[in-house]
């Protein structure tokens, strides 16, 4: 039996006050968005899912390739949720629509979930100069980091590892530490980049790969001391609930 409201509560997301949520960082962003959609559906919320980059498309999602307000509204009325995006022919992935057009859709839904970053399924990343693609109208930014990067070399666990290596001032073979994760999560040159005035959360995914939860707890506690709300867990394990 699935527990609804689990990730909404875990990340302390006030969807009534802050309904537009952009997700950035490492692998797990799409899974988190789909999980949040499930929880929001259970609460009877109308949800639009979209992306400002690329995002894996679930064929079970009702897809609207148009930003026509009437068409999107009809799909939301019928299904309660909709993916609004173009589809890339070669990859079959959802791809970005114009940001101004996306913004006009916000009044049609209760919550909008936007994947605003890419990581090629790597658990860790430091954004390039042109990243992340957080829309100006987003209320919340959630950064995702996979805890399976801990203790492993930067070159194996980071998307565009050279950016992470340069940012941390470590060589590519250096193992990722808890302190590295904290630095990446809180720096304006890391995953806090372009957050500005928005509400910010950090989700540490894949806690199930750890032998014990103390490293995750330590990171969450340290981030809290810096004023950042963070949580850890496992999207894979959550699917079994």
Describe each region flagged by the PLM.
Residues 91-98, 106, 117-225:
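Conserved catalytic-core segment of NTP-binding enzymes
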Residues 42-47, 107-111, 195-196, 221-233:
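Structural alpha-beta junctions
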Residues 209-212, 227-241:
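Conserved GTP-binding G-domain of TRAFAC-class P-loop NTPases and closely related GTPase folds
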Residues 27, 52-54, 117-118, 207, ...:
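Short, ordered loop/turn segments at secondary-structure junctions
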Residues 23, 48-51, 83-86, 112-116, ...:
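General beta-strand structural signal in soluble alpha/beta enzymes
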Residues 4-43:
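Walker A (P-loop) phosphate-binding motif
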Residues 37-92:
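N-terminal phosphate/diphosphate-binding loop that engages ATP/GTP or pyrophosphate donors
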